[in-house]
A protein has these predicted regions:
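N-terminal pre-catalytic "stem/leader" segment of glycosyltransferase-like enzymes
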Residues: 1-21, 146-149
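Membrane-proximal helix-turn-helix segments that form the acceptor-binding/catalytic region
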Residues: 13-21, 55, 59-77
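Active-site proximal beta-strand in glycosyltransferases
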Residues: 24-27, 39-56, 77
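Alpha-helix capping/helix-boundary segments
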Residues: 31-32, 53, 82-84, 157-158
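Acidic anion/phosphate-binding donor-loop and adjacent secondary structure
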Residues: 54-60, 96-116, 161-162
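Donor nucleotide-sugar binding/catalytic pocket of nucleotide-sugar-dependent glycosyltransferases
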Residues: 70-108
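Conserved donor-binding/catalytic core segment of Leloir-type glycosyltransferases
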Residues: 76-77, 111-129, 135-142
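Nucleotide-activated donor-binding/catalytic signature segment of Leloir-type glycosyltransferases, i.e.
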Residues: 154-169
């Protein structure tokens, strides 16, 4: 990746905070945004935003704290234009973005023909994924279109007792 990069790596200690003489700080999620905000020197602060983190939580304190991290005065760098706009709208943080990346030598679309299949990413342990609602929808899809192959990945659903046939990936 970065053969000429020379950087120091330190584990963060909340008791001492960020110490040292740095030219800038990059936060990469909401807890690191607050840690970097506590740094006493006046240096540029960037916030590398990879997800809209408030959506990781139901409405409540964690949602608010995550959303407020976009109001700390950073310059944001986001993965894609939607996320950059969402962060600016939610917290007022100016946010540049970079385009999504893919290694097309490894990941390609190999089947462009019509298929009677549907794919669902199920992760029941992660509330924001809405697995319960998705499974209810798939049950109705199967009732209306029993010829569709339903593919489920993300979690082993083989023992979930679902009321429709599916391919467990």
């Amino acid at each position: 990746g970065y053969p000429k990069l020379e950087a120091e790596y330190r584990l963060y200690d909340p008791e001492t905070g960020i110490t040292g003489d740095f030219d800038g700080i990059v936060a990469s999620d909401w807890p690191t945004a607050y840690a970097a905000w506590r740094y006493e020197r006046d240096v540029p602060r960037l916030y590398w935003v990879q997800d809209f983190e408030p959506f990781f939580f139901p409405a409540g304190p964690d949602y608010v704290v995550a959303e407020n991290s976009y109001r700390l005065g950073y310059q944001g760098i986001a993965c894609g234009p939607w996320l950059a706009g969402k962060v600016t709208e939610a917290g007022g943080m100016p946010c540049a973005f970079y385009d999504y990346q893919v290694d097309s030598s490894r990941y390609t679309r190999t089947n462009d023909s019509h298929r009677d299949e549907i794919f669902f990413y199920a992760r029941p342990t992660t509330a924001r994924r809405g697995t319960e609602f998705g499974l209810l929808v798939l049950e109705e899809v199967h009732r209306r279109r029993p010829e569709l192959v339903i593919n489920i990945a993300g979690w082993d659903m083989s023992q979930a007792g679902l009321n429709f046939p599916f391919v467990n990936h």
